[in-house]
């Protein structure tokens, strides 16, 4: 039967990509359906109970800047907050939060249920409705037809999912959930390039069976950072400690002895696993010279005894899992609540996508999350928001939008996937961004919120808060510029101990802040005519802008040079096979990938600077030929 209502956007899957996609589309004002096989698992943290980290928190902040849900849900559920790389420069600082699974899921569910224009429905999607080659809805397992203008697939690890524990395996999307077999088969019949990837999770431990006195405590920051620009510390639940233990030679011997029953090392699993989150088996093989590995013992929440031992993801047989867990200090009597496992699943080559995340082979169909070969909640959420936004724009017959590499880590993520593809689960790092001094986690709102408002993503409440913050930054910068310190005054005497040489002439507070030994707090109250303290988000922006002005200016110049090249479009009808001077390999890649711009072509693996120059020459000749025709 046909469902009585017709939708503009249907989102399939209720994980981190799906929830952000559905919320984004609904915020755009279009009628949106979120379809999940089980609405009790919406927003579930399937693996580690944490949000953020190096590179990842930048994505979370960008989601937040565009009014997404992840950052605020983290503030409402975070039970430990830390700033990573706090002693390094602002470009690579990152916020990481340990989250209470139950509180996080509840925060996401609350957001979904109270979002205008969004409907929820519990059913598995088994097929697509296709009209004239375009996606026009989905058919569920019970035969209900949901019609729509666009479809966003965020299937996670569910497409053809197979769970492995030792040499035993069974079909599953994750532990306790069925896989999506019918939809996987339907998608495989379409002209998409499909392959298999693998990820894994560690066994979960009962905290009552662990001796924490034998471990190193790892508390959060004394002043816990806030994840959302709209969040505050008062939102945070009770804060608790994590702990650290280590593997040892005995642990490694146990693992080596079990390798003959490892699905990874006996060829049972063919999918490639994540390079930067390897299983404990992988660590022992790849880092054979190391006799110990650090393991982080992370509580799963405030109302559960369950622990997540971060660092021992494994698909070894359960008897080996028991032995290896109990070989570690403090875990000698550990009781495993859930076994660790690996899961193998289908993913689709992201080079078959447009930059909007719409598929090239089927108009109206968008992919987001692990289906595109990424790993991580943050990467999934960011893609979901972009796919939901662009599905809504397409439903409204408006042009798509994707941030550039110099505008957002989301732009880096999408460009990497589409220009280079991936053969292993893709994880975001700050090192992937050329312009990371501009793409900091602290300024994501300054980069994206205005654009989000223009697109229709950003609420009145967030927009008002953003405008207030932006104005405060301008006012405080102006105050520092116009406030002067002269020698032999109480103000000068208070700041001189911080300087290498005392003040000998008049300085503005802005110039003083440029000094390497001076931080904002040193000058905040000098010549301060303000009624109340400056908000820490405001003072942070002021300080970074002053301290790094020269570097930021140089990056802006680099970006402008690249942008001139970025805007050089490569027409769809270019016949690369007839271009003289290009190697056959480059011709093949350009024909297959059809990059939209010269800059996009330059980022394709194997496309040399010389080849880019040849393309530019060809475009100029083509333009001259057309003018004279």
UniProtKB/Swiss-Prot annotation:
Residues that coordinate or bind NAD(+): 273-287
* CC cofactor: FAD
The family database entries (InterPro entries) matched by this protein are listed as:
FAD/NAD-bd_sf, GIDA_C_N, MnmG, MnmG-rel, MnmG-rel_CS, MnmG_C, MnmG_C_subdom, MnmG_C_subdom_sf
Output the superkingdom of the source species: Bacteria
What interactions and quaternary structure are annotated?
A: Homodimer. Heterotetramer of two MnmE and two MnmG subunits.
Q: Output the HAMAP family linked to this UniProt entry.
A: MnmG_GidA
Q: Which family does it belong to?
A: Belongs to the MnmG family.
* UniProt-recorded name of the protein: tRNA uridine 5-carboxymethylaminomethyl modification enzyme MnmG
Name the species this protein comes from. Marinomonas sp. (strain MWYL1)
């Amino acid at each position: 039967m046909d469902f009585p209502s017709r939708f503009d956007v249907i989102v399939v899957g209720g994980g981190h990509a799906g929830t952000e996609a559905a919320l984004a589309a609904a915020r755009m004002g279009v009628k949106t359906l979120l379809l999940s096989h089980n609405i009790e698992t919406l927003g579930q943290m399937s693996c580690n109970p944490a949000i953020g980290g190096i590179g990842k928190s930048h994505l979370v902040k960008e989601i937040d800047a565009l009014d997404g849900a992840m950052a605020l849900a983290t503030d409402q559920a975070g039970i430990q907050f830390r700033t990573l790389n706090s002693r390094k420069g602002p470009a690579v600082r990152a916020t990481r939060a340990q989250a209470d699974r139950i509180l996080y899921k509840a925060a996401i569910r609350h957001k979904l249920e109270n979002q205008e224009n969004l409907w929820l429905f519990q059913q598995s999607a088994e097929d697509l409705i296709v009209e004239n080659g375009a996606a026009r809805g989905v058919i569920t397992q019970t035969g209900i037809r949901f019609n729509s203008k666009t479809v966003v697939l965020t299937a996670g690890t569910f497409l053809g999912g197979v769970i492995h524990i030792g040499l035993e395996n069974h079909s599953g999307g994750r532990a306790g959930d069925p896989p999506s077999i019918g939809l996987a088969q339907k998608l495989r019949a379409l002209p998409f390039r499909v392959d298999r990837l693998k990820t894994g999770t560690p066994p979960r431990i009962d905290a009552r069976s662990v001796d924490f006195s034998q471990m190193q405590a790892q508390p959060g920051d004394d002043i816990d950072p806030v994840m959302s620009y709209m969040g505050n510390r008062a939102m945070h639940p009770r804060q608790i400690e994590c702990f650290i233990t280590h593997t040892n030679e005995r642990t490694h011997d146990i693992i080596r002895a079990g390798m003959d029953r490892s699905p990874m090392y006996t060829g049972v699993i063919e999918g490639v696993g994540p390079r930067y989150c390897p299983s404990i088996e992988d660590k022992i093989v790849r880092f054979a010279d190391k006799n110990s590995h650090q393991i982080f013992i992370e509580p799963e929440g405030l109302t559960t005894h369950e622990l997540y031992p971060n660092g021992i993801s494994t698909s070894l047989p359960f008897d080996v899992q028991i032995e290896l867990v109990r070989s570690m200090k403090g875990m000698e009597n550990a009781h495993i609540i859930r076994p660790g496992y690996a899961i193998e699943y289908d993913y689709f080559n992201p080079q078959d996508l447009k930059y909007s995340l719409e598929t090239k082979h089927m108009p109206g169909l968008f992919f987001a999350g692990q289906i595109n070969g990424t790993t991580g909640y943050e990467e999934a959420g960011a893609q979901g928001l972009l796919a939901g936004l662009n599905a809504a724009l397409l439903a409204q017959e408006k042009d798509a939008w994707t941030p550039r590499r110099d505008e957002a880590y989301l732009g880096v993520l999408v460009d990497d996937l589409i220009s280079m593809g991936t053969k292993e689960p893709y994880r975001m790092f700050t090192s992937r961004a050329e312009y990371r001094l501009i793409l900091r986690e602290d300024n994501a709102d300054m980069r994206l919120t205005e654009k989000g408002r223009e697109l229709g993503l950003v609420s009145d409440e967030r927009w008002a808060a953003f405008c207030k913050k932006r104005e405060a930054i301008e006012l405080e910068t102006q105050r520092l510029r116009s406030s002067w310190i002269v020698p032999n005054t109480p103000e000068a005497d208070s700041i001189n101990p911080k300087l290498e040489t005392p003040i000998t002439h008049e300085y503005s507070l802005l110039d003083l802040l440029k000094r390497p030994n001076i931080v904002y707090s040193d000058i905040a109250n000098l010549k301060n005519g303000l009624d109340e303290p400056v908000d820490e988000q405001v003072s942070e922006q002021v300080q970074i802008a002053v301290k790094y002005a020269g570097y930021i200016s140089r990056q802006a110049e680099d970006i402008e040079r690249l942008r001139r090249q970025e805007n050089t479009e490569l027409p769809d009808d270019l016949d690369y096979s007839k271009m003289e001077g290009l190697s056959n390999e480059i011709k093949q890649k350009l024909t297959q990938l059809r990059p939209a711009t010269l800059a996009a072509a330059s980022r394709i693996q194997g496309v040399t600077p010389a080849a880019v120059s040849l393309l530019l020459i060809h475009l100029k000749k083509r333009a001259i030929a057309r003018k004279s025709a």
